[in-house]
Amino acid sequence: TMFFAQSNVIKEVASKHSCVIVGRCANHVLEKFDDCINIFIYSNIESKIKRAVEEYKLDSNNIEKILKERDKLREKHYNYYTGKVWGDARNYHACFNSDFIGINNVVDIIEKIAINR
C-alpha cells in the first residue's frame, strides 16, 4: 500500500540524513529511531481558517468544512495505520498550541530542542 511504501522511504531517508518529516505517521514509523524528535502542533479552527485564507490565499467559502474534513481524514488515517490516537500527547515528545505560542515561536522552540538534544 501507499502507507508502507511511504514508511520505507521515510525510514531510508531518516537513516541517512537529518530531516524534517511532516505528517505521514512519521512518529510511529520512526519510533525505533533514538535520535528522532516527535512533535505535534495544533490550533483551533478559527486560527486554521485565518492561516488558510491569509497564508495560502484559499477562498474563505466552505474553508471551515474543508479543514474539518481534512483533519478527520488525518485522524482516521493515523488511527488506522498506527493503532494510536492522533493528537494524543503520549505519542509525541512535545505538543504545541500554535494559537497560544505563535507559529514562529513554535519553530524557535523546536530548533532549540533539536540543537540542544
Describe each region flagged by the PLM.
Residues 1-18:
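ATP-dependent small-molecule kinase phosphotransfer cores
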Residues 7, 103-111:
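Short, amphipathic alpha-helical "lid/cap" segments that border enzyme active or binding sites
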Residues 13, 29-32:
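RNA pseudouridine synthases
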Residues 14, 114-117:
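Short, hydrophobic alpha-helical segments
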Residues 23-28:
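Short, polar loop motifs at secondary-structure junctions
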Residues 32-55, 59-68:
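Conserved phosphate-donor/acceptor-positioning beta-strand/loop module used by diverse small-molecule
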Residues 59-104:
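Small-molecule kinase domains that catalyze NTP-dependent phosphoryl transfer to phosphate-bearing small molecules
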